[in-house]
Amino acid sequence: MLIDSQSVKTNYEGEERGFHGGKKIKGRSRQIAVDTEGNVWAVHVHAANNADTVEGCVVADLALADLQTVRGVCADKGYRGTFFNHVRDGWKLDVHISGREGKGFEVEPKRWVVERTFSWFNGQRRLSKDYEKDTTSSEAMIYIASISRLVRGHSFN
């Protein structure tokens, strides 16, 4: 299972909204858990100023409650600390935290799958930005987009 987040802008004074200092985005973060095929198993939307390491625990719990065959979890450096300990100690799973080494762009093994899933979402007009007032509606739109992708055969084309 792979977990990552994406920060998106939102216009509305909705349920949860915050400023992500590192990415300079005022809006929300989408946490998703996907399998190695890029299929979405869990979604959690929250204010962008909340830490990934804490909010990642929520999406991990949602996904792992339904999945019995997961052997490990991959995430990036934003998930060190609380998330790492929660999954390793609470769920008794191997956790692989990937990190960059050196300068420039590098394709990280397995991590590109979750990034590809986010790029598929950007092909959906409704998900290019967070237009929803509450986070549950935003989560529902992500699930609908992933179902649409499955029905069409793994692409939005």
Where are these regions (language model features)?
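Intrinsically disordered, low-complexity segments enriched in glycine/proline and serine/threonine
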Residues: 26, 132-136, 142
